[in-house]
C-alpha cells in the first residue's frame, strides 16, 4: 500500500533565515484529523514510511525549507506532489494566483485567516496550519484523477 501524506509547514516570514514553527500532516484517505507537530524531526520520524508527500507550493518552499532545516534530503523533490504545479497544468485559466486560498474558495473549503505574527509559534498558528491541510486534502481529492492517471503524466 502506498502512503501519501498531506502536509503544510509554518515558518518565520524570512525565507533566508526561516525558523520552523509547526507542521500539520495527515495520511490521504484516512478518517482522522491532521496531526500537529512543533518538532520537525519528530514529524519526519513519525512519517518516515510515507511514499509521497502532497504540499501546495511544496517544490517552491516546503520541501527545500524542510531539507535546509534538517540538513539533509529528508524529502526528495521527486516524492513531492505539488498541487500548485498541478493546478497550473490542469486549470491554468480557471485560477489567477493558484493559491491555496483561491482554490479552496472554489472548492468551498475555506482556508481561514491568521492575523498573528510569524516570529514565534502560537496556538492560532497551529490551528491555521491544520486548516491548511484540510484545504489541501480537498485539493488533493480534486486533482487526484489527473495525478493518478498514467496517460496524463
How does the language model describe each region?
Residues 42, 65, 99-102, 124:
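Exposed alpha-helical structural elements
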Residues 55, 92-96, 125-128, 132:
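Generic alpha-helical structural element
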Residues 80-112, 137, 141:
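Charged catalytic and DNA/RNA-contacting regions of genome-maintenance
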Residues 41, 60, 98, 130-133, ...:
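Conserved structured core elements
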Amino acid at each position: 500500500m502506498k502512503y501519501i501524506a498531506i502536509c503544510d509547514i509554518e515558518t518565520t516570514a524570512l525565507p533566508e533565515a526561516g525558523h520552523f514553527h509547526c507542521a500539520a500532516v495527515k495520511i490521504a484517505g484516512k478518517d482522522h484529523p491532521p496531526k500537529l507537530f512543533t518538532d520537525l524531526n519528530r514529524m519526519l520520524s513519525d512519517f518516515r514510511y510515507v511514499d509521497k508527500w502532497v504540499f501546495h507550493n511544496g517544490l517552491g518552499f516546503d520541501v527545500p525549507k524542510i531539507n535546509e532545516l534538517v540538513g539533509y534530503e529528508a524529502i526528495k523533490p521527486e516524492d513531492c506532489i505539488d498541487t500548485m504545479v498541478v493546478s497550473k497544468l490542469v486549470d491554468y485559466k480557471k485560477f489567477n494566483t493558484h493559491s491555496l486560498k483561491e482554490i479552496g474558495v472554489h472548492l468551498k473549503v475555506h482556508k481561514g485567516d491568521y492575523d498573528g505574527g510569524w516570529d514565534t509559534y502560537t496556538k492560532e498558528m497551529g490551528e491555521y496550519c491544520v486548516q491548511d491541510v484540510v484545504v489541501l486534502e480537498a485539493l488533493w481529492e480534486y486533482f487526484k484523477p489527473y495525478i493518478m492517471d498514467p496517460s496524463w503524466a
